[in-house]
């Protein structure tokens, strides 16, 4: 390995940056383009903010759905119906 000039900043070291820009392509060649491409494309690791998923909006007939819920029979109490034994 060649010695690197200590006066150079780390991002200017030879081989630290690829000669071509990164692309959005996911082919094998582009996945191994540079370390960043390998981590994000090949391994699928990204530390960016996750987009929030929008909730599904209630339909216009939500009132009829609520009405049908009230017509359902009430659930039976669980446990021993006679009460606790001593």
Swiss-Prot record:
Record-linked InterPro entries: IV_Tat, Tat_dom_sf
Positions bearing the site annotation: Essential for Tat translocation through the endosomal membrane: 11
GO cellular-component term (any): host cell nucleus
Residues that coordinate or bind Zn(2+) 2: 25, 27, 30
Positions of crosslink type Glycyl lysine isopeptide (Lys-Gly) (interchain with G-Cter in ubiquitin): 71
Main location: host cell
UniProt xrefs under Gene3D superfamilies: Tat domain
Keyword Metal-binding included in the entry's annotation: yes
Binding residue positions for Zn(2+) 1: 22, 33-34, 37
N6-acetyllysine carried by residues: 28, 50-51
Region (Core) residue spans: 38-48
Positions with biased composition (Polar residues): 60-77
Keyword annotations of the record: Acetylation, Activator, AIDS, Apoptosis, Host cytoplasm, Host nucleus, Host-virus interaction, Inhibition of host innate immune response by virus, Inhibition of host interferon signaling pathway by virus, Interferon antiviral system evasion, Isopeptide bond, Metal-binding, Methylation, Modulation of host chromatin by virus, Modulation of host PP1 activity by virus, Phosphoprotein, RNA-binding, Secreted, Transcription, Transcription regulation, Ubl conjugation, Viral immunoevasion, Zinc
Subunit composition and interactions: Interacts with host CCNT1. Associates with the P-TEFb complex composed at least of Tat, P-TEFb (CDK9 and CCNT1), TAR RNA, RNA Pol II. Recruits the HATs CREBBP, TAF1/TFIID, EP300, PCAF and GCN5L2. Interacts with host KAT5/Tip60; this interaction targets the latter to degradation. Interacts with the host deacetylase SIRT1. Interacts with host capping enzyme RNGTT; this interaction stimulates RNGTT. Binds to host KDR, and to the host integrins ITGAV/ITGB3 and ITGA5/ITGB1. Interacts with host KPNB1/importin beta-1 without previous binding to KPNA1/importin alpha-1. Interacts with EIF2AK2.
Note: This truncated variant has a premature stop codon. It may have arose as a consequence of tissue culture passaging.
Domain commentary: The cell attachment site mediates the interaction with ITGAV/ITGB3 and ITGA5/ITGB1 integrins, leading to vascular cell migration and invasion. This interaction also provides endothelial cells with the adhesion signal they require to grow in response to mitogens.
Identification of the protein by name: Protein Tat
Origin species: Human immunodeficiency virus type 1 group M subtype B (isolate HXB2)
């Amino acid at each position: 390995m060649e010695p690197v000039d200590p006066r150079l900043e780390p991002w200017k070291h030879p081989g630290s940056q690829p000669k071509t820009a990164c692309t959005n392509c996911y082919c094998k060649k582009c996945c191994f383009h540079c370390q960043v491409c390998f981590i994000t494309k090949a391994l699928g690791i990204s530390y960016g903010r996750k987009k929030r998923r929008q909730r599904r909006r209630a339909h216009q007939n939500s009132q009829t759905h609520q009405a049908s819920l009230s017509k359902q029979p009430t659930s039976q109490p669980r446990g021993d119906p006679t009460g606790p034994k001593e």
